[in-house]
From Swiss-Prot:
This is 3-isopropylmalate dehydratase large subunit. PANTHER family: 3-ISOPROPYLMALATE DEHYDRATASE, HOMOACONITASE, MITOCHONDRIAL-RELATED. Belongs to the aconitase/IPM isomerase family. LeuC type 1 subfamily. The gene is leuC. GO terms for molecular function: 3-isopropylmalate dehydratase activity; 4 iron, 4 sulfur cluster binding; metal ion binding.
Amino acid sequence: MAQTLYDKLWNTHVVHTEEDGTTLLYIDRQLLHEVTSPQAFEGLKLAQRPVWRISANLAVSDHNVPTTDRSHGIADPVSKLQVDTLDANCDAFGITQFKMNDLRQGIVHIIGPEQGATLPGMTIVCGDSHTSTHGAFGALAHGIGTSEVEHVLATQTLLQKKSKNMLVKVEGQLPHGCTAKDIVLAIIGKIGTAGGTGYAIEFGGSTIRALSMEGRMTVCNMAIEAGARAGMVAVDDTTVEYLKGRPFSPQGVEWDQAVEYWKQFKSDPDAQFDRVVELNAAEIVPQVTWGTSPEMVTSIDGRVPDPEKEKDPVKRDAMERALHYMALEPNLPIESIKPDKIFIGSCTNARIEDIRAAAWVVKKLGRRVAPNIRLAMVVPGSGLVKAQAEREGLDKVFTEAGFEWREPGCSMCLAMNADRLEPGERCASTSNRNFEGRQGAGGRTHLVSPAMAAAAAIEGHFVDIRKLG
């Protein structure tokens, strides 16, 4: 019987299935960070249980770490406690961890792939919503809760019910100035934040296959914002080439065997999906969110929508509330919106490809950050990304233009550290969520690509980067 990629990943990890469909799945890799792991480790200690498979776990602090000078440690006592607790727990249980001042430290969903700890055919979990990122490698990856983190630590298994299959097929040549971020925002704009509820989404088509692994990770990262349990892309030569020679990747003869095994992780030609959504890449335009949900998105050459034109009363009320919170008027041209702050970073867009794209725009425009921009910051996704960017001189491109070049971490993606918006401040952000208060109480978030964020920093308002040439 023909199988989808999701079917294959699921079926190769089933330990046992109950009559009601509840399935015990084997988990190949668990990634840990400081926010959702303390209670899990405490549960193990209270029950006097060991970690079942120590080598299957990899930990890093990312949510609470400062992105400025780290020589004085962490100022906030709560943040410091969480980071110190992860350090102590990993030391006690023997789990590999990249501590705050380790060059390999970074955002958990960036360090996993760059270390080769994320591999095709794996089941991967983490106590974090955006674990779907790792599905870009032909893996089944999704976020879990703290009690489930403990369960995986203790048993290397997880109770799950199988999702339905969805294929999002994007075909054609992506226009100049458009990126993976624009693709996924366009997808969410089309199907909505509940469009993927109950599904695991496979992203396919010629446009997706043409993306780099960085681009594929951006798309899969935001599958959760479409309501999906997981997002994934089939294995191909791009996948294999990215993983070759990475520290956790198989080596020698084992590498050859692994590559042969990975080749199966793609949907069979005649596999059936429960839902298929198609997009024409040629019609995708640089995207900007205007509201308080990723589905509230439009093109850079568009206008803020008018709630009065929405027939659905529930949607109309949501639009009115969003516009009030965002302090925007209906029919306002998107290009006239002026951010106060610029954030280039997060597990969505803080890889070397993203940093290069933003730097290219800054060099192309050849000017400094606009006077109305209070802060423009670039936060690399890991110490290794930061080091690579510095070898290429990209840090100088930013700092000479008036940007701040920071240390790696989750930073302004969420208000859980020192990097945050003040009430009423507006931010052009390359992150994944624009909910009320996400970047700070009363903060207003517009989700965009790194290139779009960089252009807004220089021009002082959103601009259509397709015009840069």
